């Protein structure tokens, strides 16, 4: 019986250590700086690898906005949202709520 008590105590200690480790991880505010560095590295990689494939302006637009490919024959179109649309989508508000507030 004492073995099971020690085993349960060891498992609880491991769970507490895991929670402490998760608390020390990067907060969401810090993650955006990591993403900026990742985007810079990705842009540099595109510039170095695709020397003959992309022009410098084309590579910058590839990293800035997500692209929509409506069909394979047409050019890709960037998605752009206004700030109010972004805020409403984050708050899960319908579009008519925004019009009612004006």
From Swiss-Prot:
Tissue expression remark: Predominantly expressed in adult head. Expressed at higher level in males than in females. In adult brain, it is specifically expressed in the ventral lateral neurons (LNvs) as well as in 2-4 tritocerebral cells and 4-6 abdominal cells.
Gene: Pdf
Taxonomic lineage of the native organism: Eukaryota, Metazoa, Ecdysozoa, Arthropoda, Hexapoda
Position of the signal peptide: 1-24
Family, similarity comment: Belongs to the arthropod PDH family.
Protein name stated in the entry: Protein PDF
Native source species: Drosophila melanogaster
Deleted gene: phenotype: Increases total sleep time, decreases sleep latency, leads to loss of morning activity peak, and a failure to wake up in advance of light-on anticipation. In a CCHa1 mutant background, diminished morning activity and phase-advanced evening activity compared to single mutant. No significant effect on free-running period but reduced power and rhythmicity of free-running activity, which is further reduced in a CCHa1 mutant background. No effect on photic entrainment of circadian rhythms.
Physiological role: Neuropeptide PDF is the main transmitter regulating circadian locomotor rhythms. Required to maintain behavioral rhythms under constant conditions by coordinating pacemaker interactions in the circadian system. Together with CCHa1, involved in regulating intensity and periodicity of daytime activity, possibly by modulating rhythmic expression of circadian protein PER/period in a subset of clock neurons, but not TIM/timeless. Acts on small and large ventral lateral neurons to control sleep and regulates the state transition from sleep to wake.
Keywords for this protein: Amidation, Biological rhythms, Cleavage on pair of basic residues, Secreted, Signal
Major localization class: secreted
GO biological process, one term: neuropeptide signaling pathway
Residues bearing the modification Alanine amide: 100
């Amino acid at each position: 019986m004492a073995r099971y008590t020690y085993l349960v105590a060891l498992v609880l200690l491991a769970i507490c250590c895991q929670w402490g480790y998760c608390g020390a991880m990067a907060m969401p505010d810090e993650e955006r700086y990591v993403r900026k560095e990742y985007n810079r590295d990705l842009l540099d990689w595109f510039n170095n690898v695709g020397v003959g494939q992309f022009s410098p302006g084309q590579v910058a637009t590839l990293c800035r906005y997500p692209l929509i490919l409506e069909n394979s024959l047409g050019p890709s179109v960037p998605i752009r949202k206004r700030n109010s649309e972004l805020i409403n989508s984050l708050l899960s508000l319908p579009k008519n709520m925004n019009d009612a507030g004006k």
